[in-house]
Each structure stands twice: as C-alpha cells, then as structure tokens.
Amino acid sequence: TNVIKNIFKINRKINDTVKAIKDFKPDILFTVDSPDFTLRVAERLKKKDPNIKTVHYVAPQVWVWREGRVKKIKNFIDHILLLFNFEKPYFDKENMSNEFVGHPLLDESSEGKIDINQIFEKNKALISIFPGSRTSEIDVLMPILLDFIKLMNKNYQDFIYIFHSTKQYYDLIQSYIKSKNISNCETISDDKIKSHTLKKSVFAVAKSGTVSLEICKSKVPSIILYKMNFLNYLIVRSLVKVKFANIINISAGK
C-alpha cells in the first residue's frame, strides 16, 4: 500500500483502533506484523495505559534500515517474537526482551502428495508466478508479468504459467490474463495445489516477500521483483542499508 498517499486515513484508523482497544480493556495486546500500523497502535495505547502488556509478532526489518528503532520500540513493546535467528542480536544489543520462534513456512510439515498432471493434463513445463497479495501490488505487477510471458512465448512454446492467488484475488488476476488473450496461463487458489505446483515448477517469478522463503524451500530457481512509485523509491533509496532486497539473499549475505 502507498503509505504516504494514505497517511491521514491510516492515522484515523490508528486512533479508532486505539480507542476500541482501550474500551475493551484487555490485559495483553498482541500485535502481528504491519509495523507502520500495529506499532503505532501499541505506542499510543501504552501512553494511555502504561500497565497493559504488549507482545509483537514479526519484528520490523531493523536489519534493513533504521536500526535505531529498537531503542524506541522497547519503550512500548514488552516482548517481541522473531521469525529469523539473525534478527536476535539487534534486539539483544538494546536489552529488549525477545524470542526467536521461527518461520511457519520453514517449520511446516510436508502435506500429502497431489499429482499435478491430473490438474494440468498438458505435457509442458510449469513456471510459477506470484503477483502479490494486495490489490495495489497485483495492479502494478500484472501488466509487467504478462508482458514477460508474451516475450517468452515469442521464443519458447513449452511452458505453462501458473499464477498463484488467493480466492479473494482470483477473479482480478483472471481478468488481467483474459485482457491480454494469453492461452498458456492458469490461475490456482487452492493452497495444497499451489504448494505442489510450485514443487513441480522449473522456475518461479515472484513479488518480493515471504513467498521467496517458500520458493527457496522448494528449491526452485527464481526471479524476485518489486516496483514502487518514484517518490517512495527516492525516500527508500536514501535510507536502506542492505545490498539485497530478497530475504534469502540477505540471510545468505550473497
């Protein structure tokens, strides 16, 4: 989402959320991810009620930029749960209570096997495509991804492109595909089918994010992409301190 564009709307939602939580009077506030929203809620709530205990799951990416945020965060978050072990030193350094709990994608047990050939009865190699999990991301990336497929089709006729979606965005993705009249594309939204389709894929193209972990776990070569508007790009470029944009490359340091 374009945070800069929607800053006033977001601020209003934060205040509404803080009020609703305060009226509910919980003993513990448990926030998950989305630090631009959840941590602001926790901070404002803590000011109004210093006795409430706060726990946050999925640490903000202080290893990418603004490492100094930890000093501020520990003033209103009592305990933070970490996805990656390499994050721990950043919070230990500031004596902030934290715990490495792991990432669900890396810990999940294997599911029952599904024969992908029963789903796609076509003797062609699969390329998995992950266009994002928000409307704004899909709207930005689908035209780029479909142009990529059209270019590939000019030289290679042996691939089927599988768009991985949720039921919520299935129709949106399908509408983009139909608008370009590309026949060798499929869209799937069933999680078990998606998992095994990825494992059968020879390649993947994905929007930067958690999905890159799943792709890596499946040992599928990939291209990771992201596109932001020019104003956001200028701001982020001056603040980001890591060399890589993909969590896998950041973890590996190469």
Task: List PLM regions with ranges.
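Nucleotide-activated sugar donor-binding and catalytic core shared by glycosyltransferases
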Residues: T1-K254
